[in-house]
Amino acid sequence: MKRIFLLIATNFAILLVASIVMSILGVNTSTMGGLLVFAAIFGFGGSFISLAISKWMAKKTMGCEVITQPRDSMERWLVETVARQAEKSGIKMPEVAIYQSPEMNAFATGPSKNNALVAVSSGLLYGMTQDEIEGVLAHEVSHVANGDMVTLTLIQGVVNTFVIFAARVVAGIINNFVSSNDEEGEGLGMFAYMAVVFVLDMLFGILASMIVAYFSRIREFKADEGAARLAGKNKMIAALERLRQGPESGAMPAQMSAFGINGKRSIAELMMSHPPLEKRIAALKNS
């Protein structure tokens, strides 16, 4: 969830900047080719900037302490386990870090398979057995090995481009409609036009977030499958069962709930980056 939050936050900022820059430059929505190029530059630009700084940002915002020299047997075991799983997955050893949080959480981030970070919370280390922790680590290493950070960045870039492009096309149509029905033919005016674009950016942005969340849920199932291969199905199921017994998702800040969020039903599930734990456990048992 952490990587999704950082992507979405950065991309909403990019949408706002795009709106301002386009208005200043007077980009004409009737010039579809130019608008599409402009939208793609901003759409993918925001996503790749977010990806490039993801590891640095995670360390700063989460207060991650990277293990360079293990201080005790637990840290040594963490590093050795991640190293073994990374070698088995055919990727370079990710950095391993611990951050202070009472919640049982973990996340993986980084710009590429061979430049990644796997971090676990102190709450996870003290709240799970070693087998369960191994399952969690395998899940995060699988995210890295599957290239999920890059995959979601590309998806986010596509939907960002759609949001920027579609919002301005629709705003242009509204402006032309108002202009045709206005005796003076002035249309919306600059500030009203910017307000319409901003509202459309937000509406299309919500739809885009649902699309990204949908693909993220698919990647979670894939990471669970990968974890089952790396650590064993029973260890992964045990980790998910432990998370299910923990606090409800409402007790966790959304941007920190990087692993195993208990999903809500109906429309709320469409915005979840992770499937409900029950579905993940059932998928593993049936695999």
Swiss-Prot record:
Note the InterPro entries from the entry.
HtpX_protease, Pept_M48_protease_HtpX, Peptidase_M48
Active-site residues, Swiss-Prot/TrEMBL: E140
| PANTHER family noted in UniProt | PROTEASE HTPX
Question: What binding details are noted for the cofactor?
Answer: Binds 1 zinc ion per subunit.
For the keyword Secreted, the answer is: no
Q: Could you provide one GO biological process annotation from this protein's UniProt record?
A: proteolysis
Which co-factors does it depend on?
A: Zn(2+)
Q: Which Gene3D superfamilies match?
A: Metalloproteases ('zincins'), catalytic domain
Question: Membrane topology for this entry?
Answer: Multi-pass membrane protein
Localization in the cell: Cell inner membrane
- HAMAP family membership: Pept_M48_protease_HtpX
Q: What sort of enzyme, by top EC class, is this?
A: hydrolase
State any single GO MF term: zinc ion binding
**Record-annotated residues binding Zn(2+)?**
H139, H143, E220
Similarity comment: family membership:
Belongs to the peptidase M48B family.
Q: Give GO cellular component annotations, separated by semicolons.
A: plasma membrane
EC numbers: 3.4.24.-
Name of the protein this chain belongs to = Protease HtpX
Q: Which Pfam families match?
A: Peptidase_M48
CDD domains registered for this protein in UniProt? M48B_HtpX_like
Transmembrane residues, as ranges?
A: 4-24, 33-53, 154-174, 195-215
Q: Which organism is it from?
A: Shewanella frigidimarina (strain NCIMB 400)
Alphabetically list the UniProt keywords. Cell inner membrane, Cell membrane, Hydrolase, Membrane, Metal-binding, Metalloprotease, Protease, Transmembrane, Transmembrane helix, Zinc
